[in-house]
């Protein structure tokens, strides 16, 4: 099965769907001030036609309510900054393209658009028709838009996904080189780490090269991804998956060879690795780059009347459901659908232990980029 066929969130609106489990998380809340600053710089740059129509794309938009929460933040930031800057008497039209792979459940987003437009008019005063939302399916490691046609490109929790599993794991090191893990975890061998870093470098360089061409000169990108900081990082969602899969092997429910022959196309770069790639590629300048922590259950609330122990268990089940909604399609394609309930039941147990220890944070990186002006524009 082709990777792009399984690299998507759980579809529909069922109990394990991304639409039901995703919510406005801490990462989105943390990103919003950076988003406003990025929009402010964008409006001041006086790009072509920006006072009439701002063209925006959300790359790797996923599906469900979170997609439109991101869109809402973008629209609110444009309107807020525009009002503060007193750019125009009339608001510009905003054209937003939602991008993800062809298998993404775009229909779950389209169903929400009528109510989203009405809410936007009621709360923001934006008349229906002044914000135009459409889909642009396809891999963001390929061309999506005409050259110099976009003002702002946004991506949250997407660029850590690779275009493919690193080929070096199979070609140079052989099947089973990454024993005991599904990704480039802290404990994996240096050659595995290098294979993943090489693939990320190749993919992120391609991403920057292609999409910088699609931006107007001095256009902006704002990218957020999961990252690593040091060897003391707390377990991230993929570490919890590693633990749960290894439990199934110990219990005899899964063959060890199944794990050793599977690697997920996901890489958590360091801030320095991202910085070096941007500087080496050369089409964009870094305006700011920061890291921050987000908690697994930051978006989850529960009645205080529940016992503390119940709090932890319910939160752990929420964490397991959220992780399941993101990773189940690609995991089920290799390990089989039948084992999924057992896998995520064990993941919930590990999540409960992590939460009980007062841990459960993962590191995030946010980077704001500006396309360097052409020599003729300087």
Curated annotation (Swiss-Prot):
The record's free-text note on cofactor binding: Binds 1 Mg(2+) ion per subunit.
Catalytic activity, reaction form: 7-methylxanthine + S-adenosyl-L-methionine = theobromine + S-adenosyl-L-homocysteine + H(+)
InterPro entries in alphabetical order: MeTrfase_7, MeTrfase_capping, SAM-dependent_MTases_sf
Binding annotation for S-adenosyl-L-homocysteine: 18, 61, 66, 100-101, 139-140, 156
Gene3D superfamilies hit by this protein: Methyltransferase, alpha-helical capping domain, Vaccinia Virus protein VP39
Biotechnology: Tobacco plants (Nicotiana tabacum cv. Xanthi) expressing CaXMT1, CaMXMT1 and CaDXMT1 accumulate caffeine and become less appetant and toxic for caterpillars cutworms (Spodoptera litura). Caffeine also stimulates endogenous defense mechanisms against other pathogens (e.g. tobacco mosaic virus and Pseudomonas syringae) by triggering the expression of defense-related genes.
Documented EC number(s): 2.1.1.159
Residues where theobromine binds: 157, 160-161, 362
Residues the entry annotates as binding Mg(2+): 178, 260, 262-263
Role summary: Involved in the biosynthesis of caffeine. Catalyzes the conversion of 7-methylxanthine (7mX) to theobromine and of paraxanthine to caffeine. Has a 5-fold preference for 7mX.
Protein name per Swiss-Prot or TrEMBL: Monomethylxanthine methyltransferase 1
Taxonomic path: Eukaryota, Viridiplantae, Streptophyta, Embryophyta, Tracheophyta
């Amino acid at each position: 099965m082709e990777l792009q066929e399984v690299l998507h969130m759980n579809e529909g609106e069922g109990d394990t769907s991304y639409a039901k489990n995703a919510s406005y998380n801490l990462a989105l809340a943390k990103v919003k001030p950076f988003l406003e600053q990025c929009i402010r710089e964008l409006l001041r740059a006086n790009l072509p036609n920006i006072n009439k129509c701002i063209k925006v794309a959300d790359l790797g938009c996923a599906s469900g309510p979170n997609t439109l929460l991101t869109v809402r933040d973008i629209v609110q930031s444009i309107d807020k900054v525009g009002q503060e800057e007193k750019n125009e008497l009339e608001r510009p039209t905003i054209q937003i393209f939602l991008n993800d792979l062809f298998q993404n459940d775009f229909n779950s987003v389209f169903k929400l658009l009528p109510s989203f437009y009405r809410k936007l008019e009621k709360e923001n005063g934006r008349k229906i028709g002044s914000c135009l939302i459409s889909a642009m399916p396809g891999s963001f490691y390929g061309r999506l838009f005409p050259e110099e046609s976009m003002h702002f490109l946004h991506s949250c929790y997407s660029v850590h996904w690779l275009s493919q599993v690193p080929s070096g794991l199979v070609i140079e090191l052989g099947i089973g080189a990454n024993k005991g893990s599904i990704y480039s975890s802290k404990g994996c061998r240096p050659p595995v780490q290098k294979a993943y870093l090489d693939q990320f470098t190749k993919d992120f360089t391609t991403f920057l090269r292609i999409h910088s061409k699609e931006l107007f000169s001095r256009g902006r990108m704002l990218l957020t991804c999961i990252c690593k900081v040091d060897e003391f990082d707390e377990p991230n969602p993929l570490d919890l998956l590693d633990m749960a899969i290894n439990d199934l092997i110990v219990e005899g429910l899964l063959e060890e060879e199944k794990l050793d022959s599977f690697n997920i196309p996901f890489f958590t770069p360091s801030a320095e690795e991202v910085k070096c790639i941007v500087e080496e590629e050369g089409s964009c300048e870094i305006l700011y780059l920061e890291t921050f922590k987000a908690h697994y259950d930051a978006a989850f609330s529960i009645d205080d009347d529940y016992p503390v122990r119940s709090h932890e268990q319910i939160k752990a089940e929420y964490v397991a459901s959220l992780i399941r909604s993101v990773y189940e399609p690609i995991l089920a394609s290799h390990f089989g659908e039948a084992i999924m309930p057992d896998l995520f039941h064990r993941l919930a147990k590990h999540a409960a232990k992590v939460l009980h220890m007062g841990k459960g944070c993962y590191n995030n990186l946010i980077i704001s980029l500006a396309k360097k002006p052409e020599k003729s524009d300087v």
